[in-house]
């Protein structure tokens, strides 16, 4: 459930005040497909491409990035569905991708033999749609029938269609096949002929955040509109979701009503009725066999004990439902440690924790009424990712390991065993032998120590004026920034002589819920202060200088870089802001923005707009101030963060006389790009822009 919580967090990722809606001269740019708005976008696009694509070395940069992004030597993580292992794969010949499968024995071989199940490029051509893969949910245990998620252009809204993995065809709706129209929704299998569905059921069925309010139980062959209601959320809630765990003999079906981004109610679906889990609203629960795991986001005093925020507790499920509150503690946080994820297998739970931004892995088993743990080997300054191969139907799992300078490896492991099989390893996309990684700390405005990693030339002092350096950060939604290998970063920046810096800001999850909560709402400036402190520390150490320091961030990180631009422009030589938020006066009225009120606050409330207005980039940019040159990027098909945030910020900055470039992809959703070639173009423009500004 922790992983699902993270995925959900990545998915969801007018009273008084300045610049009220009627005073905004660029509201017309909020019309995503408006003729005037798109004409403006095309004009900006052309100017940006003309400015950057003629740069000396730009073609070579793009080709180098293409070698990385289109390389057949990439990891192919798989999911076991029935007896087969499935993987989704894109390459130069299949830009939209192949859904394919193989056997476990073949997957473990040096050269797996894959069978294509669905060719998305062929489907897109046949149906005249720019389909982007969104995943598959298959009916256990055979996984013959699957619900495939397909989006137009890569947005969060998608269609859901039943697919037969034996025949390789979609199940005809006329023959009783399940299909849901485009919406930000989904469904989970209850049995072969029943789904729990959350989707757009018509007027009034979606929340202010744009997510479903209703969960219905839909029987095959019956009209969707007549499906009986299971749960209904409020109009101001974030939305409802359903999950299914398919452990043999103990399958569970969970339904969640999310009242805010980090709080909600969870229910078990049992014999057609809902049983509420009596947990704290901001805690998340995960069934594991006959046990229930509960992860806390705030302190909980219960059963005569006080459990700290960030703890992971365990108890027998039926005992908990009967009122029992005597928990066993699997993890309790310390000032320097936090739980990053827990993964449930058939007979064990894997805990991934972070100690001062260094990851540790342990395995927990419940035997004879007690939980017992053992440590598993892991790296130091690296990144780990754990994925159950077949959910709770198996003890096998995939472990991905990498660090800034070591290409990622994909390993097959099994609970209870130390031996791991290395399945695949990325090639070295750049020469890392001349680089070194160091962890440093900056001191923020209020005295808080802020850790950051730096990837720099090995054994070489900085030149006069410092290295051309790129500072990346995020600082929100309890999402951790971890060291990891990126061929794109290596080829596009490090191999060009650049230094890379990754900051671990308050608002993130590196030190658990308290680290996140320290930068919520009225404390949001702390995250910005942390970022600025890292920039100042880099300059003070002589690693770089303002004219050679660039910053980059996406989504909330785009807000971060935009705030840094308007608050401390003298610190930076270039800014890249990707799919950003900028208009914090109207963010909650644009697409999924209302779901983020818990993170930022509600600008409709004067007392909350008072602090939001102090940092909202769109309302704080000024004419007559020297700003570094900026590149904004976005996507027309981003239905999570509205492209108007980038569009309007660019228009305002340009009107104020600042040098700003803008590039908007026509598809790609919040990721910004849907195909390999689109990714090549996006990253070539971004790194080419940074090189032009910082390496002259």
Q: Which ranges hold each PLM region?
A:
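Beta-propeller blade signature
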Residues: 100-103, 161-166, 212-221, 267-271, ...
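Cap/lid segment of the alpha/beta-hydrolase catalytic domain
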Residues: 121-142, 150-157, 169, 174-176, ...
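Polar, glycine-rich mid-to-C-terminal structural blocks
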Residues: 212-258
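Active-site-proximal cap/loop segments of hydrolase catalytic domains
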Residues: 489, 502-696
């Amino acid at each position: 459930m922790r992983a699902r919580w993270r995925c959900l967090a990545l998915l969801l990722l007018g009273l008084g005040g300045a610049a009220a809606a009627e005073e905004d001269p660029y509201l017309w740019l909020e019309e995503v497909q408006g003729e005037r708005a798109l004409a403006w976008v095309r004009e900006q696009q052309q100017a940006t491409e003309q400015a950057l694509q003629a740069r000396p070395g730009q073609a070579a940069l793009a080709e180098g990035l293409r070698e990385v992004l289109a390389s057949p030597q990439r990891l192919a993580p798989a999911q076991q569905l029935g007896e087969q292992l499935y993987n989704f794969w894109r390459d130069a010949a299949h830009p939209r991708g192949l859904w394919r499968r193989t056997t476990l024995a073949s997957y473990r071989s040096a050269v797996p033999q894959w069978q294509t199940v669905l060719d998305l490029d062929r489907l897109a051509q046949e149906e005249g749609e720019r389909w982007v893969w969104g995943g598959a949910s298959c009916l256990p245990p055979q996984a013959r029938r699957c619900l495939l998620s397909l989006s137009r252009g890569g947005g969060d809204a998608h269609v859901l269609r039943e697919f037969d993995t034996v025949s390789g065809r979609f199940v005809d709706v006329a023959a009783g096949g399940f299909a849901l129209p485009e919406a930000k929704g989904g469904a989970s299998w209850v049995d072969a002929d029943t789904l729990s569905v959350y989707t757009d059921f018509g007027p009034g069925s979606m929340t202010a955040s744009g997510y479903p309010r209703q969960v219905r139980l839909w029987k095959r062959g019956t009209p969707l509109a007549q499906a009986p209601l299971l749960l209904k959320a409020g109009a101001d809630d974030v939305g409802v979701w359903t999950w299914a765990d398919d452990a043999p003999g103990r399958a569970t079906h969970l339904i969640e009503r999310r009242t805010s981004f980090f709080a909600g109610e969870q229910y078990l679906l049992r014999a057609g009725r809902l049983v509420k889990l009596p947990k704290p609203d901001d805690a998340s629960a995960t069934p594991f066999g006959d046990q229930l795991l509960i992860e806390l986001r705030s302190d909980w005093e219960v059963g005569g004990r006080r459990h700290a925020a960030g703890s992971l507790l365990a108890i027998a499920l039926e005992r908990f439902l009967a009122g029992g509150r005597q928990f066993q503690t699997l993890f309790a946080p310390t000032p320097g440690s936090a739980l990053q994820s827990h993964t449930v297998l058939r007979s064990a739970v894997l805990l991934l924790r972070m100690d001062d931004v260094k990851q540790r892995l342990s395995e927990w088993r419940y035997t004879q009424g007690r939980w017992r743990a053992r440590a598993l080997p892991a790296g130091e300054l690296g990144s780990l990712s754990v994925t159950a191969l077949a959910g709770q139907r198996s003890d096998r799992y995939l472990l991905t390991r990498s660090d800034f300078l070591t290409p990622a490896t994909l390993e097959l492991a099994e609970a209870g065993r130390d031996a791991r099989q290395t399945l695949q390893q990325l090639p070295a996309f750049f020469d890392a032998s001349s680089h070194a990684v160091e962890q440093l700390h900056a001191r923020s405005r209020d005295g808080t120590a802020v850790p950051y990693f730096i990837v720099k030339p090995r054994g070489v002092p900085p030149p006069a004026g410092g290295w051309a350096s790129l500072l990346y950060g995020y600082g929100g939604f309890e999402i951790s920034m971890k060291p990891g290998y990126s061929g794109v970063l290596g080829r596009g920046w490090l191999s060009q002589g650049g230094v890379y810096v990754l900051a671990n800001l308050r608002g993130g999850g590196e030190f658990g819920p308290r680290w996140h909560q320290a930068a919520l709402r009225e404390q949001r400036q702390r995250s910005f202060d942390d970022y600025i402190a890292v920039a100042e520390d880099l300059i003070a150490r002589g690693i770089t200088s303002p004219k050679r320091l660039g910053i980059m961030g996406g989504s909330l990180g785009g807000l971060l870089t935009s705030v840094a631009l308007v608050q401390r422009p003298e610190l930076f030589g270039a800014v890249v802001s990707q799919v950003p938020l900028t208009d914090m006066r109207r963010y909650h009225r644009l697409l999924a923005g209302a779901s983020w009120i818990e993170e930022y606050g509600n600008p409709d409330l004067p007392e909350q707009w008072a602090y939001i207005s102090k940092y909202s980039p769109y309302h704080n940019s000024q004419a007559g101030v020297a700003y570094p040159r900026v590149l904004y990027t976005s996507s027309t098909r981003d239905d999570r963060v509205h492209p108007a945030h980038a569009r309007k910020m660019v228009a305002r900055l340009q009107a104020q006389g600042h040098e700003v470039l803008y590039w908007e992809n026509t598809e790609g959703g919040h990721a910004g790009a849907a195909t390999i070639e689109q990714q090549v173009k996006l990253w070539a423009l971004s790194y080419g822009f940074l090189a032009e500004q910082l390496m002259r």
